[in-house]
UniProtKB/Swiss-Prot annotation:
Family (UniProt): Belongs to the ectoine synthase family.
SUPFAM superfamilies reported for this sequence: RmlC-like cupins
Protein name (Swiss-Prot/TrEMBL): L-ectoine synthase
Gene3D superfamilies: Jelly Rolls (2.60.120.10)
Organism of origin: Marinococcus halophilus
UniProt keyword terms in alphabetical order: Lyase
Amino acid sequence: MKVIKLEDLLGTEREVDDGNWVSRRFIMKDDNMGYSVNDTIIRAGTETHIWYQNHLETVYCIEGDGEIETLSDNKVYQLEPGVLYALDKNDEHMLRGGSKDMRMVCVFNPPLSGREVHDENGVYPADLD
């Protein structure tokens, strides 16, 4: 069994800061669970283009506020604590931080290796290993 404390991830290679967001990666590919789990902070007032062509992601908002816009149809959904969204079709989207930092629990399949950052198209590589 694994028990992981957030405080033990801070300042390590499992904490990845991309400017608009900081992701603390609890479970990764090398944990052999078949998925990865991140605790991610989306910074207030930011806008990030994301298009996970190689991953599916489910996201649950636990703090703060913001919005997500699906670029295929320009629908905008408000995000606040208690809202979950699933990018089940590799949906290209814009993620916007609101008036406060937004804290999200993110699950990826296939799992992240831990070093991923978005490329110029908002994509994580399929596999860094």
